Every structure is written in structure tokens, then in C-alpha cells.
From Swiss-Prot:
It comes from Oryza sativa subsp. japonica. Expressed in roots, leaf sheaths, anthers, and suspension cultured cells. One of its GO terms (molecular function) is GTPase activity. One of its GO terms (biological process) is mitotic cell cycle. The keyword Transcription regulation does not apply. Disulfide bonds: none annotated. Tubulin is the major constituent of microtubules, a cylinder consisting of laterally associated linear protofilaments composed of alpha- and beta-tubulin heterodimers. Microtubules grow by the addition of GTP-tubulin dimers to the microtubule end, where a stabilizing cap forms. Below the cap, tubulin dimers are in GDP-bound state, owing to GTPase activity of alpha-tubulin. Induction: By gibberellin and brassinolide. Down-regulated by abscisic acid (ABA). Its cofactor is Mg(2+). GO terms for cellular component: cytoplasm; microtubule. Belongs to the tubulin family. It comes from the Eukaryota. This is Tubulin beta-6 chain.
Length: 444
């Protein structure tokens, strides 16, 4: 079967990851001890995408947990599903990365990376036909960003033909945890552009807004934010784990979403988002789901899709529904908002349908879009980066770990290139594309 190996790094990654396993265990009917306690055979049919079956009939997540300090790991271990993970798959240091990308990537992280890779290899060898890796991390700290990107590049070397999917939490525009976030994020993006296949871009502020505005939570906790993320994560892979009429997997997703190799940063959304109290009072319809799914307020990163155009998009629907209706709704969205889709990629919205809805809902949908407006995120980080880098503020923390200023300059220009690539394709029209081809022909 097509297994996915899950890796979580740093405090943010481990907190999202542990929430994700709660959701997936719940979907597959696996209790906190790893025993199956579900009600339907469908839960077990492809349980091996995310789980290994141990000799005594227990299901063990294909998860690798890493961090440079023991704190978060301890709380995962004592959390509700802490006992389900394989104890050898916890890999942690003692020193911490102190929000320093260089520590995660070059010094502390580099010392720990080999023991992480050993665990990854062991897990990969346990797979029948490994499809790819999914990595949860944040880009603002030290471990998730520095060591996370180091691990991604090492895995890329060793498994060049497997998919590499990341769920990356970007620094938020208004809420900042650390001053050096722009540095860490820019250095990470520099790596992700080259080594990842698909990046789902998340950020806390957009998630807060969803909790506050849509879910009517007055004081959202990180647990609430992570629950939103894990609903999306589970939605992206539901087609692999449950039978459906139109299946998609990580590679199909990439083929349909990535027109140019560097432009693989996606916005994600989830529907239905209703506050916990009012869920049972409304029946859901496919048109409602579709409408909410495309709504800018539903996007889990602080970029507004109305400020750009969609190169491509993909929607995964879950639940019993007619594929014909799904197709009609998707075509409807494109026809009504044609100015928000680039016209030089016809039929650029793909949909897939999986028959099993998430727990407690009759139907749901997950949205993944490749929109040029994601450049707003990069632009914002880049401006903050430049403001500090111009004065060489905080640089000594990085050069002290053996980094060179040159690396910062490279990362900065790579990110600015990315922004202008998005801008270029946002402005491109179908006639222009033909015109350019003619020009090339003349020059040849």
C-alpha cells in the first residue's frame, strides 16, 4: 500500500503532529493504546497508510518525532495518545536551538540529524511501497525551521523520487513570537523552494481569525488552531485511506497543482467551519460547502486570494454526494469568478471525492489552492528581513554558529525571485504566452 511517513519537528511541529494523530486515530477507530475499537471494516482497509501493525495486533503510527529539547516531547508522551508512538521514534537533544536557525541547521541539529535519519530509514524499510513524507514544522523558530529543512534536504538526497509534503507554519503578520522570525523564515523558504515538492502554508494569525470570526471562540488556544490544521491534514490524505469515487494521492496532487517547479506553496482551507454549538442545526449541501471552501476568510494563511489569481486548485470532498453535483459546483465557481483564474491553464480546478466523512459531519471538503497571492506572505517576511539585515541586527547569533552573511543574501534574493515569479504569472495573459512563443521562434 502507499504509505506516508510522518515527521514532526520542534515545538510547533510536535504540537500540531500530536493533534493530527488524535484526529487520524479517531477516523480509523484506533484507541490510545493502539488497539482497534472501530465499527466499520472501511477503517481498517487501508489503515497501513499511516500505521504499522505490530505483532500483537496493535497499530503503531509511522511517525518520527524530533526536537532539540525534551520539553515538548514529554508533553506529547504524557498526552492522550502519548503511549501509541514507538518509544524509539522519539529523538531529542538537550540543548535547544534557542530560536536560532543556524543552531538547528548547522550545529546542534547537525549533531542529532544522524540519529533522526536512522529512525527514518528504519520506518521507510518497514513500508511496502513508500509514497512520501509529510513534515510538520514552523519556520519562525530554530528547530522546526533549521533542523526541519536540514532533515528535508537529507531525505531528498536519500529518497529523491518520493514525494515531500510539508505543513509549514509561517510567522504571522501582527503576532510575533521572536524578533528573529524573518531571518529564520527566509532561510527556511530558501531551502523549501529547492527541496520540498509541496508546501501547505499556514499561519497563526489567519487561524486565530477563523477561530474568532467563524467559530466564535472568544479565547482560542493553540489546541484549537492545531485542530483546524489537523482537519486539513487529514483531508489532504483521506483519498488514500478511504475508498472514494475520484481518488487523489500526493503525486496526483502535485501534478495537478504545480505548473512550474518552484511555485509549490499552497493555501489551504477547510469547510464546513461552524461553531461547536451550532453544528447540529444545519444540514450541509454541496453548494454551501463549495461556497465556504472558496471563501477568502477560510484560508489558513494571511494572504487574500482576491488579490491574486489561482494558477491551479484542488478540492477534496468527503461524504456521500453526487460527483455530478460536485463538478457542476466547481465549474460554477470558475465561471462566476473567471477573473480570479489564469486563463492560460484551462480546467485548472481538480476535484476528488471520498465516501467517508470526518467524525461528526455528514460531508466536508478540503481546499488546496496555488494562488499567486501567496506572494503577500513572502513579501511581508522579506520586508521585515531586509529591515533588520540592512543594519545587520542580530546577525552575530548566526555568524557565531559558523554561518556566512553571503547565505543571508542568497536566501533573500531567492525569496525575492520567488515573489517576482508569482507576480509574473499573475500578470501573464493567454495572448502574451502565444506572443512569447512566436518571439522565441523568431529568435531561434
Amino acid at each position: 500500500m502507499r504509505e506516508i511517513l510522518h515527521i514532526q519537528g520542534g515545538q510547533c511541529g510536535n504540537q500540531i503532529g500530536s493533534k493530527f494523530w488524535e484526529v487520524v486515530c479517531d477516523e480509523h477507530g484506533i484507541d490510545p493504546t493502539g488497539r482497534y475499537a472501530g465499527t466499520s471494516d472501511l477503517q481498517l482497509e487501508r489503515v497501513n497508510v499511516y500505521y504499522n501493525e505490530a505483532s500483537c495486533g496493535r497499530f503503531v503510527p509511522r511517525a518520527v518525532l524530533m526536537d532539540l529539547e525534551p520539553g515538548t516531547m514529554d508533553s506529547v508522551r504524557t498526552g492522550p495518545y502519548g503511549q501509541i508512538f514507538r518509544p524509539d521514534n522519539f529523538v531529542f537533544g538537550q540543548s535547544g536551538a534557542g530560536n536560532n536557525w543556524a543552531k538547528g541547521h548547522y550545529t546542534e541539529g547537525a549533531e542529532l540529524i544522524d540519529s533522526v535519519l536512522d529512525v527514518v530509514r528504519k520506518e521507510a524499510e518497514n513500508c511496502d511501497c513508500l509514497q512520501g513524507f509529510q513534515v510538520c514544522h514552523s519556520l519562525g523558530g530554530g528547530t522546526g525551521s533549521g533542523m526541519g529543512t536540514l532533515l528535508i534536504s537529507k531525505i531528498r538526497e536519500e529518497y529523491p523520487d518520493r514525494m515531500m509534503l510539508t505543513f509549514s507554519v509561517f510567522p504571522s503578520p501582527k503576532v510575533s513570537d521572536t524578533v528573529v522570525e524573518p531571518y529564520n523564515a527566509t532561510l527556511s523558504v530558501h531551502q523549501l523552494v529547492e527541496n520540498a515538492d509541496e508546501c501547505m502554508v499556514l499561519d497563526n494569525e489567519a487561524l486565530y481569525d477563523i477561530c474568532f470570526r467563524t467559530l466564535k471562540l472568544t479565547t482560542p488556544s493553540f489546541g484549537d488552531l492545531n485542530h483546524l490544521i489537523s482537519a486539513t491534514m487529514s483531508g489532504v490524505t483521506c483519498c488514500l485511506r478511504f475508498p472514494g469515487q475520484l481518488n487523489s494521492d500526493l503525486r496526483k496532487l502535485a501534478v495537478n497543482l504545480i505548473p512550474f517547479p518552484r511555485l509549490h506553496f499552497f493555501m489551504v482551507g477547510f469547510a464546513p467551519l461552524t461553531s461547536r454549538g451550532s453544528q447540529q442545526y444545519r444540514a450541509l449541501t454541496v453548494p454551501e460547502l463549495t461556497q465556504q471552501m472558496w471563501d477568502a476568510k477560510n484560508m489558513m494563511c494571511a494572504a487574500d486570494p482576491r488579490h491574486g489569481r489561482y494558477l491551479t486548485a484542488s478540492a477534496m470532498f468527503r461524504g456521500k454526494m453526487s460527483t455530478k453535483e460536485v463538478d457542476e459546483q466547481m465549474i460554477n465557481v470558475q465561471n462566476k469568478n473567471s477573473s480570479y483564474f489564469v486563463e492560460w491553464i484551462p480546467n485548472n480546478v481538480k476535484s476528488s471525492v471520498c465516501d467517508i466523512p470526518p467524525r461528526g459531519l455528514s460531508m466536508a471538503s478540503t481546499f488546496v489552492g496555488n494562488s499567486t497571492s501567496i506572494q503577500e506572505m513572502f513579501r511581508r517576511v522579506s520586508e521585515q528581513f531586509t529591515a533588520m539585515f540592512r543594519r545587520k541586527a542580530f546577525l552575530h547569533w548566526y555568524t557565531g554558529e559558523g554561518m556566512d552573511e553571503m547565505e543571508f543574501t542568497e536566501a533573500e534574493s531567492n525569496m525575492n525571485d520567488l515573489v517576482s515569479e508569482y507576480q509574473q504569472y499573475q500578470d501573464a495573459t493567454a495572448d502574451e504566452a502565444e506572443y512569447e512563443e512566436e518571439e522565441d521562434a523568431i529568435q531561434e
